[in-house]
Regions:
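Cationic, low-complexity basic patches in intrinsically disordered or flexible, solvent-exposed regions
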Residues: 3, 36
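Short hydrophobic targeting helices and cationic amphipathic motifs
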Residues: 20-22, 29, 40
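Enzymes that bind and transform nitrogen-containing heteroaromatic metabolites
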Residues: 43-275
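Short Gly/Ser/Thr- and charged-rich N-terminal loops/segments
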Residues: 32-33, 43
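Short hydrophobic alpha-helical segments enriched in small aliphatic residues
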Residues: 8, 15-18, 26
Length: 275
């Protein structure tokens, strides 16, 4: 639900250290740690277990659907973005589908070399007060040279350790920061710890789509839900909901009401997630 295409500079510092902890990482860091066999598929280890405070902030129709073309028709104002500013979350996180729809180039990354798993790595291309964070499990999105920022915030991609080394080299050539965590999909808890410890992300807004929202909720990573309901109903079958993809055996996630307000016919409701 965001746009913008300036660009960022970067610099690189290489390093390897088998006793490495996140608190000792320095700025502009590029590290490969596949030799850490105990940690190979569990992400970088942060002894403090700290992560950002995470708010899921969404605009939806009254029936909870979030298709962007639809929501733009039921809120043609800036209420969504004004509310996001009020939440005090300068960094945002979006799923691959949303990124592909709004920001990435058409097509997918084509490997030219035999596949080599990236393993655990991170690359900090630029020091910034906030980041536009994206999830791309296997590393397939293509980026224009001028799209290293979204809304003036540098891109930071989260991938699995099964992403190819060639793709990470591609991101680095674009001066795009990245984190790899997890072998069987992305280890989101570990990635969130890295965001806090290395990239200094203290408050994070998850802004869709439904699958990344659902995954974060299912893992207990959402602290607060901020829902804005536009004055319309979608009603079309098969359209994404604000939270999608949780296993069928899961129980509902209980919430505690925080506040509600009306803004020109739009309802903004906030809830704390019960832990």
């Amino acid at each position: 639900m965001q746009q913008g295409r300036p660009h960022a500079n970067s610099s690189i510092v290489n390093g390897k250290n088998k006793n490495l902890i996140l608190g000792s990482f320095v700025r502009n860091l590029s590290i490969r740690v596949t030799e850490f066999s105990p940690y190979l598929c569990s992400g970088f280890k942060n002894k403090t277990k700290m992560r950002p405070y995470i708010i899921c902030h969404m605009m939806a129709s009254l029936d909870g659907r979030i298709d962007c073309e639809m929501t733009e028709q039921i809120d043609d104002t800036n209420h969504y973005y004004e509310a996001l500013t009020q939440l005090g979350c300068p960094s945002t996180l979006e799923g691959k589908t949303t990124l592909a729809m709004h920001y990435a180039q058409d097509g997918v990354f084509q490997q030219q070399r035999p596949h080599e798993d990236a393993g655990q790595q991170l690359y900090k291309a630029v020091e910034a007060a906030s980041y536009a964070i994206g999830v791309d499990t296997r590393g397939t999105l293509l980026w224009d040279d001028n799209t290293t920022e979204i809304f003036g915030r540098p891109l930071l991609m989260i991938l699995s350790e099964r992403a190819s080394q060639e793709y990470l080299d591609y991101l680095k050539s674009k001066h795009i920061s990245y984190i790899t965590a997890g072998c069987n999909g992305i280890d989101l808890p570990s990635a969130m710890e890295t965001l806090r410890a290395v990239f200094n992300v203290e408050r994070l807004a998850v802004v869709g789509g439904g699958n990344i929202n659902g995954s974060m909720l299912d893992l207990g990573l959402i602290d607060e839900v901020s829902m804005m309901y536009g004055y319309g109903i979608d009603g079309r079958g098969g359209m994404a909901a604000a939270f999608d993809g949780r296993p069928m055996d899961r129980k509902p996630v209980r919430l505690t009401f925080k506040s509600v307000e009306e803004q020109d016919g739009i309802i903004w409701a906030r809830y704390q997630v019960n832990k």
